[in-house]
Design a protein with these regions (language model features):
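Gly/Pro/Ser/Thr-rich low-complexity, intrinsically disordered segments predominantly at protein N-termini
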Residues: 1-233
Length: 233
């Protein structure tokens, strides 16, 4: 008699999607503010053990893939630098230190309610809201700092966690270092600086070539003089 073993159904691994197919931002102003802030923070934190992620799923409960949120910009310290498809707290061992939401009237309730409560429970040290269209926030840029288990408003616009002074410039968040007051350039300004430095280098090389050419021409003239009149006294 042949005894058949019961069929064992394979256990499917839990999937943690990296995207829901929704647009990154609802308007150009929101997208631009996110992209600029993301790039400036990445440049600022280059060389440090940190990563800056934008509009990517943050999973905060292992085994529960629906327990997720997608901050517009988040900064995480004490993790490997570089991008990720998504961020799982239990794998990385660190919660985001700072989160930015580029808010609007349509996301107002979620940003000031559910997300603020969630980020406080997670232990996110600073939570910043920026309203590029100035639709609903009394202050267009408002930060909150975690004290105990609740957030308190940041009055002076200073991110102590990042070491930066935050302000508004033409629908974008501008950043200045707290230690020396240096302004972090916007990507367009950084590109202009690179172009100016490149042009200055080209100008210096051209001037050097012209000087060498003039020297060679002078030596030719002097040699002709010597050939005709002899050495100069």
């Amino acid at each position: 008699m042949v005894i058949s073993a019961p069929a064992i159904k394979p256990v499917n691994p839990i999937e943690y999607p990296s995207s829901d197919g929704e647009p990154v931002a609802e308007t150009y102003d929101h997208f631009y503010a996110i992209a600029i802030l993301l790039e400036m923070l990445r440049q600022y934190l280059t060389g440090r053990q940190a990563t800056v992620l934008g509009n990517q799923y943050l999973y905060y409960a292992q085994g529960l893939p629906r327990m997720r949120v997608a901050p517009d910009v988040m900064v995480i310290f004490e993790v490997a630098a570089g991008g990720r498809d998504n961020y799982k707290i239990w794998e990385e061992g660190q919660v985001p230190a700072v989160i930015f939401e580029i808010t609007s009237k349509s996301t107002q309730i979620t940003d000031i309610g559910f997300k603020r409560d969630l980020y406080a429970q997670m232990g996110v040290l600073e939570y910043w809201l920026f309203d590029p269209k100035n639709e609903w926030l009394e202050q267009q840029l408002q930060g909150y700092r975690l004290k105990g288990e609740e957030y308190e408003p940041i009055i002076a616009g200073q991110s102590l966690v990042l070491g930066l002074q935050l302000s508004i410039e033409d629908k974008k968040i501008a950043l200045h270092r707290l230690d020396n007051g240096e302004k972090l350039p916007f990507p367009s300004e950084l590109a202009e600086q690179v172009n100016q430095e490149r042009q200055a280098k080209l100008d210096a090389e051209q001037a050097k070539l012209q000087a060498e050419q003039a020297k060679q021409e002078l030596e030719v003239l002097l040699q002709r003089y010597r050939d005709r009149y002899g050495d100069l006294e």
